[in-house]
């Protein structure tokens, strides 16, 4: 066992709170507070879906074709900062993102190909 990090916050970006809430219905922030106050209760999971984030950059531009001006049932949020795409070489190299929720693990590529562009 190796200690990697001790941190008073949840995971970065949208991953901890937003994606957990979308996938399971569980309030992750409330859970963190309950752990800190030593009153944590086992969560009641109300949803069993998949969610994720796709970051917009030069390498992922094909996934975003025709998504820019359209909305799809699986699309929770999109944030496009610029269409002057740059190549991602690190964690913060992105030009926007989209957040999705769907019923099956990792079907988004197929859904985008089917509904986003041909």
Predicted regions, residues:
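Long, Lys/Arg- and hydrophobic-enriched amphipathic alpha-helices
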Residues: 60-118
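Active-site "cap" helix and flanking loop/linker of ATP-utilizing ligase/carboxylase catalytic domains
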Residues: 8-59
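Protein kinase-like catalytic core scaffold
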Residues: 2-5
């Amino acid at each position: 066992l190796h200690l990697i990090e001790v941190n008073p916050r949840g995971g970065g970006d949208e991953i901890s709170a937003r994606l957990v809430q979308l996938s399971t219905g569980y309030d992750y922030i409330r859970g963190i507070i309950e752990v800190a106050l030593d009153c944590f209760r086992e969560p009641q999971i109300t949803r069993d879906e998949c969610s994720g984030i796709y970051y917009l950059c030069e390498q992922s531009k094909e996934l975003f074709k025709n998504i820019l001006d359209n909305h799809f049932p699986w699309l929770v949020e999109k944030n496009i900062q610029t269409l002057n795409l740059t190549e991602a070489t690190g964690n913060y190299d992105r030009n926007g993102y989209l957040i999705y929720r769907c019923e099956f693990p990792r079907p988004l590529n197929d859904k985008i190909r089917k509904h986003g562009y041909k």
